[in-house]
Amino acid sequence: MSTKVLIANRGEIACRVIATCRRLGIATVAVYSDADRNARHVRLADEAIHIGPAAARESYLRGDALLDAARATGAQAIHPGYGFLSENADFADACAAAGITFIGPPASAIRAMGDKSAAKALMAKAGVPLTPGYHGDQQAPDFLRTQADAIGYPVLIKASAGGGGKGMRKVERSEDFVDALASCQREAASAFGNDHVLVEKYVERPRHIEIQVFGDSHGDAVYLFERDCSVQRRHQKVLEEAPAPGMSAERRAAMGQAAVDAARAVGYVGAGTVEFIAGPDGDFYFMEMNTRLQVEHPVTEYITGTDLVEWQLRVASGQPLPLRQEQLAIHGHAIEARLYAEDADRGFLPSTGTLRRLRLPAPSAHVRVDTGVEEGDSITPYYDPMIAKLIVWDVDRDAALRRMSQALADCQVVGVTTNAGFLRRLVNTDSFAHARLDTALIEREQAALSAVGDTDDALWQLAAVAAVASTAGATTDARDPHSPWQAQDGWRLGASAPRVLPLQQGERRHTLKVWTQAGGWRVQCDDAAPMRVTGTADAQGLAVQLGERRWTLQLLRDGDQLYLFGADGQHRFTLHDPVGESDHAVADAGSLLAPMPGRIVATLVAAGTEVKRGTPLVVLEAMKMEHTLQAPADGTVKGYRAKAGDQVGDGAVLVDFDAA
């Protein structure tokens, strides 16, 4: 094998590759952009070399810079990770021309599978089942709509060169087709530099099942069983598990053989994934082949006891596959959840900022955490906002589900908004718990997944106690608890006044009053009867009793944000200044602000138009995806402060708005 490997990637996958290389005694070279100068993968590698500015197209997507870095450091091989140049055939060719091993499939296989239309034709010849659709070169909007009409709705528009859920739209009606096509093509052109699309029949209530395949240069190929990736939003995977629930041995063998046939058809070498759409009737159809390691590969590693990165390194050096098909077996059940910096209650808008607190579950035989960040690092608008992958394993699915729910509850993240609460609710939905899986599961479970009303009422009282305790010097077990200078009870001549604390979580808001008393507090929420809370509390946490329940919670105060961490997860409250709140409940009802830095793609409503709350007004491209910003209330669009093509900063005013 190579003795020094350059990793042409960043974040958690770069750290993942470094870990295996270190175990095998292989030296590693990290590359970094301006934004990643102090990133975790840079700190972990044996060497690191700068390759350009923060923008990916000027750094991680520059094949020439990566090859220069490999030559400068004496790296004999390049591991591309996933994303960026991992499926770029020209880059694979350039590595070969430079005498540097590309740890991936041959360029010919990447080309064959990279164009989805051509790949479909190739799979048809190989006898791999296909969904009905149009995979040709004609791209005129009217022609494609005619094809969609003939196929029958709903249809799926997909970027031919795409992946990762980008450049993909489901269309329900003919009259919506042209607008969906335009949006899909814009996103595809931006993400892949190619706006060519194909149109396919959308299989109702489909499951997304993929097969992990591996080939070597000696002509052998195996499948390492399946992963169920049906739980998605916006065509991006949210939860992945292996093996697929309810998979019969016969269907597993049939799908595995079809995947191996697909790999053999293109002379595949290395790790690859063949993705299928599976219908409720048991039929399955080839969707695409990803010619790289997948984000969700750890669940396969858990159930097979393999290290797929090690397999990649060995196969790339010309060694045969480490195991034959008959030596591979499934052991237990594994589930992966992707912890993202995003706001599930605001359409999954990405969140940027500094990780002022980051506590993830402790790794064990049952829990694995793959991450590219540490406390103090920043989530920037330049790259994917993943914080970590949480992977759990146990002897069966029910046990693995319990472990995942607890792992998500153990996550403590301050500085950005995350999807941890959403993921925990998702894992605990009836549909997921009972394996009623399809790609519409999240849409179907919207009511259960909403965070509105999710917080236990008792936690509001405890949050109020925490707000008092987080004040400097406030603690019921202070050195002299009887000293008047330690009192936080609002005492004044003539009466004992409570602390008045307006607290907010999401759209829910309450005013709480707290009286500090001997051994605890008396807390009133709005006009309800006051409740007695006993125990101890300080700026680090609470150990208290409310009614018949005992609570042990960690506490963190970050400006006006109050965080409670307990056995059921993380709870964030905003503490408002009670002075003048009635006049300033909304920071600025007369405008629509950019939720993150990005580029304006389109303005959707003319100035002067009266709109309803939720009407789409602006399309913003950020973090490789298009995000539609909606009217905050009923009212009139007065005008726009940015036009299509403009770059805007976080918090920039985009629309002047008159609320009705």
What would you call each of these model-derived segments?
Residues 1-274, 278-297:
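N-terminal beta-alpha lobe that positions the nucleotide/phosphoryl donor
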Residues 582-660:
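Structured functional modules or segments
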Residues 323-331, 443-446, 450, 570-594:
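Long, charged amphipathic helices and adjacent flexible linkers at domain junctions
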